[in-house]
Amino acid sequence: MKKFLSSPVVWLLLIVLMIFWPFVFFGKVPLPVDTLVGAYLPWLDYKWGYIVGVPVKNALTSDAFSTFYVWKGLVIDLLRHGIFPLWNRYSFSGTPLLATFHTAVLFPANLLLLLPSGFGWGIFILLATIAAAFSMFLFLGTLVKEKASRVIGSLIYALAGPMTTWSQFGTAVWAASLLPLILYCLDGTIKGRRLIYFPLLTFLIGLLIFAGHVQLLTYTAVIAPLYFFYRQKKTLGKINPGLSLKVILAAGIGLGLGAVQLLPSLDFFARSIRSQENYASFFNFGLSHWTQAIRLWAADFFGNPVTINHFSSFSYHEYSSYLGVFVLPLIVSFLPNSFFSYLFFASLFLAFDNPISRFIFSLPLPLLTYSSASRIFFLTNLAAAVLAALSIDNLFAGKTSRRRLLFSGLFFAAVTLVAIFFVDGEHRAISLRNSSYYLSLLSAFLLSSVFIKNRFILSLLLVLLFSFDLGRYYAKYNPFVSRTFIFPDTPVTTFLKEQKPPFRIAREDTNLLPANSWTAYRLESVEGYDPLFSSDYAHYFHRLSGNPYENGVSRYALLEGINHKFLSAANVQYILTKNTTEASAKSYLAADLVKEGYLPVFTDKSVTVYADPAVKSRAYFVTKVRFAKDKAQMGRVLDDPQFDPTAEAVIMGEPFESNFGQNEVLAINHRDNEVEISVRSQDGGFLILSDAYDPGWRVYVDGTKTTLYQVNGAHRGVIIPAKTGQVTFRYEPASFKLGLVITLASLALTPLYLLGLHLLKRR
């Protein structure tokens, strides 16, 4: 037992468990659904056991529940029913689910969500942080000797900077946990002790692809080869062509394992809004201003959103870079000539605004520059964790000068004090108060490091100081809440769930049902939020609000006005509005809805639900089809006030005979990857299904595959011959089929690859 309790692995585990104490001891869930019930209607109308409503800790992390949690829940629900999660029919009138990439559909840890609601998510988030800590602990075993150094480096990697602020989103920390393991395997291949490192590298690369964080995947694809060749030169004195070829083959098979995810995502990326929206450029590509550098060691210098005193124009969440108050003094006092020193300064150089970084991130580089440059702080975190561990290791060995450590610490303390005087008077008190914490902790660290000679006492104090600092940073930012807050029912959601499907909903305001949250109730909407959704649908969506088709696109599809005919054609039967007399929160759509013939059918406190009595069925026939030669002409047709999408259609392509008679839709059986429609077609007609078009959909008329048309820019259409009885739409994307074949082939190739390595070693 004594040996067990003295194990650094046990201490590392206990530290992480203590940081997650609200979940471990009280079952509170690491998911910010306090924001759901405390800031959004219809939940806001209820107190949920509180006197004045649920207090909201951190609204900046709302994407964790409104996107990532509901996506994971949908994936598990589909798998539970034996349906492969290819398609999400609940947002954007339908959108790819697997191909969206950050849904991480195939990540094995998703299976934890089969556990009871809330508990499974808590385990999922907790294990991600544990995995990050343990992977760094394993990797540091090849670089440092002291157990305390390994524990501290592991804590820095698992808890510093974006590892804390992105913790509850469920993808980034899992992806980051794999990077040290990949580097560890590369080291193992160079040392040549065991062949297992090659297939393990293959497996980890595939797992990284499935983890669902494209930036970390891209960064790994850059730094892993650089690290591999650097370590070869350092260890072997040269680049070994045979070894390099073996590793390249292992990595190639790993990419093949992930092909079932990569190919659909790359295919979808080419048709998405990602390269067209100006989100990243609007925020200067996510580059940090040099004044934000102080947040590397004083996270709350500009305040904190949790305490509602953050006053910087740079988002606390997006630009999170905190390494811990002790890390930079350690790095400066002992800066080795190593790969991680170069990585540390290169990542900082690219993360902060300068002509070179601005030029690089302004380039159209898919998977890299279409997202925020601040994501590179994950690499800063990695390098800092290794460098800090090396510095502490050398501190114990007497190679890190304690005097230099003292002066470097005093330097950062002086910079902090000077910076306070440059803060405007209104906010200076915040910076002064918050900095006092960091300066006090830094003083304790410097005094301990300089004057305590006993190795055991110093090790214990340093571990405690780092644990307290980084644990406080994590606990302050991330909410742990009651499971009862996870998408509870309200009269409004209950009313909508009781209506006969299929139908879609929309809202007049983002304070009504946060984007995508309706997925948790299995309600379908024309709206949605996603950095990766169809560009064609984004343009079409403008017409629902009465805006021009060619307007710019963004990751938000939010109703801004009423275009009744287009909403009806999209099967929008219910629209939620605010029901209040307060001028600042008064409904701006209610009067227009009444004018267009919508009827108020349900009211609960601050929310009124309007219904369209003339809404079109999910599938309907039109008697007139127009033809456009390109998207520009199609856009002009859709913008034409005389165009009526409930009675006619416009498609791109060669004209065909469109003299259609009367037809009837008898029944619709709407499933996730398949839609079956029974029709009565006397003379032949043109059938529209108002689900979003995607090239992966196929259509079968009485069992025979036929042409699927993209209708009105975003919906699906098909010519129905006379005497037809059954129409079936199936989602069968070719990219998924090809990817699956490559993945299975790579899986089969892995043991053959290992066998080949074994035979080569015996020769």
Predicted segments with their positions:
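Selective detector of the "anchor" transmembrane alpha-helix that sits immediately C-terminal
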Residues: 116-141, 323-342, 441-446, 737-760
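Membrane-interface coil-to-helix junctions
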Residues: 18-136, 155-177, 270-276, 281-325, ...
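Contiguous transmembrane helix-bundle modules in multi-pass membrane proteins
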Residues: 9-11, 171, 175-177, 185, ...
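Transmembrane-helix signature of polytopic, membrane-embedded enzymes
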Residues: 137-159, 193-196, 342
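Perimembrane helix-loop-helix junctions
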Residues: 1-2, 219-254, 265
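Extracytoplasmic
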Residues: 283, 430-433, 464, 468-661, ...
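Active-site-proximal, structured, solvent-exposed surfaces of multi-pass membrane proteins
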Residues: 516, 641-763
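Short aromatic/hydrophobic helix-turn
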Residues: 152-164, 200-207, 257
